[in-house]
Amino acid sequence: MSKATYRRFDPWRAAPVTEESRETILSGHYFDIDRTSFDSRDIGHFDRLIVHKNNGDSVGVIGLTDDGLIPLIEQYRIPVHRWTLEIPAGHAIKQGERPLDVAKRKFAEEVGYEAEHLTQFCRFINNPSYSTQYTALFFASGLKAVHGGNDDDALMSSVRYFTPEEAFHMVKNGTILDAKSIIAIQRVYFAPNHMVGDEHLG
């Protein structure tokens, strides 16, 4: 017997829990942590710690240079005590800064390129079990070298260049472990001809 269900998926249907109270126990520039109390008909009263992202979406940018290379940031990440390879990424630093604006700024700051075109190709929830954080991913094309690169924490980061094949191989063998970078690299590797859209920068 088939286990398929035919109810249309609706992410906004009525919630099975009711929020009763919320208390911010830690407040930071990028996120707050709230202790939130819920009530459920099935399991009763319970509490959860929820990370609430501030300043809009996080943003990641992947691009290809004229010679077909992907610029990645090699940097030391203190929370995981290891060096990582990641696409340029960041957050809004002022009210009203759009994800597109963040993508433009971070790509220039971190790898030293301006992009003639920036196209959003993906948006995902980082971890819906405890966080409200979304990440928007952009593809940068029409690159022009400008002054920049290693803007933040320069002593702990450098720009490296890889072919899509090399980057994908490092995804497969576990060298690249950063989630946003894995998603972006696989998209470029498997669908290189479907990255550029109509979102231009003036």
What is each model feature region?
Residues 1-17, 83, 153-202:
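Nudix hydrolase/Nudix homology domain
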Residues 97, 112-113, 176:
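Helix N-cap/coil-helix junction residues
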Residues 19, 114-121:
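A short coil-to-beta-strand element that immediately follows conserved catalytic motifs
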Residues 3, 55, 60-105, 153:
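Conserved Nudix-box catalytic region and its N-terminal flanking loop in Nudix hydrolases
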Residues 71, 86, 106-108, 119-120, ...:
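Conserved beta-strand segments that form the floor/walls of ligand-binding pockets within enzyme
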Residues 37-42, 127-147:
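Active-site-adjacent beta-strand/loop module that shapes the phosphate/pyrophosphate-binding cleft
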Residues 35-37, 63, 139-141, 161-163:
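Short, well-ordered beta-strand micro-motif
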Residues 22-62, 66:
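Acidic, metal-coordinating catalytic segment for phosphate/diphosphate chemistry
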